[in-house]
């Protein structure tokens, strides 16, 4: 006796398992991981989304919650498991997992604890998706991108840190607010380490090709009567402020990550400030990852733009690199 499905649907092609074209995996279903997931789904970037975490109930709940929204999405398959086999054939893997900094904990100690987590995660990712591109989001992102590159054995163009993509977006938003234009029309770059020692490239800030530093030569310096330097200070402090107010940041970083993924999956060759291996650039001698303007396309991070930086900006970049190396050189088991 034929089932209802057999009566309803007459097959034309043989049934076979299809390999997804644009599968994306998100590792870690905390606030940041789920913001990445919903941003990816909202932009219809993937034909299969896989979620992985160690907390099975939370993981299943998040998966079901997203699946129940399938009618409103263009992603036919949403899966989740604590076993990494669920991630097989991913084009892009987003790593948001990691331990949180405890009160009074040193950065080195936090990084070392995250290294121990990544030693389990990264080999599993590469085992099931040897051709994937990994985007590292977990903090401290620049050091953990280096750790991921070391542990994965992947070429450096396929290991990318979310880096200063969000810092630069915050910078452009805050400047645009002051000027009364849309952030997309206000161009400016934050480079270096994501966070406290980031570098605002004031020499490159422009609106419609007009260099703002030509209009106000003191822009970004301590002598500036309009105090534009405050904008960069606000960028650095903004995450701390949001965390103080709501406990964590997630929406903006989720949108930022989806933006990076779009550039790669759609082969756009857009330029983003993301964390890459900078050894040999700007006189940096060690194997550190920092944000520079990078071209992202289907192959990953394919080139770096040589920005004309002023001497003080180069000095700040080198300072960032030294800070990171100071922590990296003492990491164990890499």
From Swiss-Prot:
User: Could you name the Gene Ontology cellular component terms for this entry?
Assistant: mitochondrial inner membrane
Please tell me where NAD(+) binds in this chain: 30-58, 100, 139
Q: What is its main location?
A: cytoplasm
Its pathway, per UniProt, is: Fermentation; pyruvate fermentation to lactate; (S)-lactate from pyruvate: step 1/1
Q: Which UniProt keywords apply?
A: Acetylation, Cytoplasm, Membrane, Mitochondrion, Mitochondrion inner membrane, NAD, Oxidoreductase, Phosphoprotein
Q: Does the keyword Membrane apply?
A: yes
Instruction: Describe the function of this protein.
Output: Interconverts simultaneously and stereospecifically pyruvate and lactate with concomitant interconversion of NADH and NAD(+).
Q: Give the superkingdom in one word.
A: Eukaryota
Classification from the root reads: Eukaryota, Metazoa, Chordata, Craniata, Vertebrata
SUPFAM superfamilies named among the record's database cross-references: LDH C-terminal domain-like, NAD(P)-binding Rossmann-fold domains
Which principal EC class is assigned to this enzyme? oxidoreductase
- Record's bilayer topology term: Peripheral membrane protein
Q: Which residues carry this modification: Phosphotyrosine?
A: 240
Which Gene3D superfamilies does this UniProt record tie to the protein?
Lactate dehydrogenase/glycoside hydrolase, family 4, C-terminal, NAD(P)-binding Rossmann-like Domain
- Which residues does the record list as Phosphoserine (modified residue)? 44
Self-association or partners: how does it assemble?
Homotetramer. Interacts with PTEN upstream reading frame protein MP31; the interaction leads to inhibition of mitochondrial lactate dehydrogenase activity, preventing conversion of lactate to pyruvate in mitochondria.
Q: Which gene encodes it?
A: LDHB
What processes in GO biological process is this protein linked to? Answer: carboxylic acid metabolic process
Q: What is its EC number?
A: 1.1.1.27
Write out the GO MF terms: L-lactate dehydrogenase activity
N-acetylalanine (modified residue): where?
2
Protein name (record): L-lactate dehydrogenase B chain
- Protein localization: Cytoplasm; Mitochondrion inner membrane
Asked if the keyword Methyltransferase belongs to this entry, the reply reads no
Where are the N6-acetyllysine modifications? 7, 58, 119, 329
